[in-house]
Amino acid sequence: MCMDKLGTYLSDHLSGSIVAIDLARRRASSQGNDEFGADLRRFAAEVERDQRTLRNVIASLDASPSMIKELMASGTAWVDSLRSAINLPGAPNLVRDLELLIIGVRGKELLWKALAEIGIETDPPIRELQDRATAQLESLDVLHNLAVEKEFGSGRAPSS
């Protein structure tokens, strides 16, 4: 097993989880106590658990997370939050943010699959992590559908 490549791969996913947690928390806070806020708070807590598992895997392989990548992930999250706060053109919207989270969870599914394929054991077991990722995707997909309706309207475009 090529530990350098695996360590880099795991650090990339760790960085992604930092951005996802920040994005989910920020979006949950801006949504308040509506269905989006509650579900995104729950999602952020689940991703934090997944992140702890990933950190444990990295430690068990005697690899170290990349501080540079973690700082870059935190910086990216900060810039994105700043864009939202000052309402710049192209500032994130709920639909886009949910799509980013969906992409991230799909990547996480592939991470767990890759670890299973190379025989890495996790606690909780990989099957449980895969099931949680699948449930997260289903939940985010429902939220995405609701957000599309909320942000863009529910009617069909007029025919020409």
What are these regions (language model features)?
Residues 10-24, 40-54, 75-82, 101-108, ...:
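Alpha-helical transition-metal enzyme core signature, strongest for iron centers
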Residues 60-91:
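Carboxylate-rich helix-loop segments that flank metal/cofactor sites and access channels
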Residues 2-31, 94-119:
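Alpha-helical bundle segments that constitute or directly flank the non-heme di-iron/ferroxidase center
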Residues 104-160:
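Preference for long, well-ordered alpha-helical segments
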Residues 29, 33-36, 40-43:
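Interfacial loop at the N-terminal end of multi-pass membrane proteins
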Residues 28, 32, 55-58, 62, ...:
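Long, hydrophobic, amphipathic alpha-helical segments used as structural scaffolds
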Residues 41, 45, 59, 63, ...:
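Short coil/turn segments at secondary-structure boundaries
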